[in-house]
Amino acid sequence: VGTLYYGDSGTPIGIEDNALAHLKVAITTKLRRGESFTVSWRHTEGQPRGRSSLWMHPSIPLRFVFDDPEPADLDRGWIEELMRSANTAGGVTLDSEHLDTGPIPAIDTQPIADDAE
C-alpha cells in the first residue's frame, strides 16, 4: 500500500500502489495545468462513519510514497477516466478497494489561547 501525504497535515492516506500510480499521473497533469479539483472517498472500516474530500490545488504540497520500488504498469484508459472525472463537479472518487487509510486522528478541539490577556 502506497501513501499520499497532502498539505502540511502529515496525515497519511493509504492507497494501493497501482491506484496511487494512476492517481499521481492524473493529479500531476491537472495541477501542472493549474486546474484544481477534488478527490473523495468513503471512510473504510475502522474509521468513523463518513467520507473525506481533498481539494487538489497547485499551491498545496503533495508527496506520493510507493511501497513497491518498481513503477506500476499504467493503464491509459484508467488515467483518462480519472482525468474525465476530475473535470466533473464531483471530482475523482476513490473506491474503497483501493484504500487503506486506517483510523482518522482526532482533531485537537482546544481553543487557541488569546495572548492579549
Predicted regions and their residues:
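Short, surface-exposed beta-strand-loop junctions and turns on beta-sheet-rich folds
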Residues: 12, 21-22, 46, 70
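Histidine- and/or cysteine-centered catalytic micro-motif in compact active-site loops
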Residues: 9, 18, 42-44
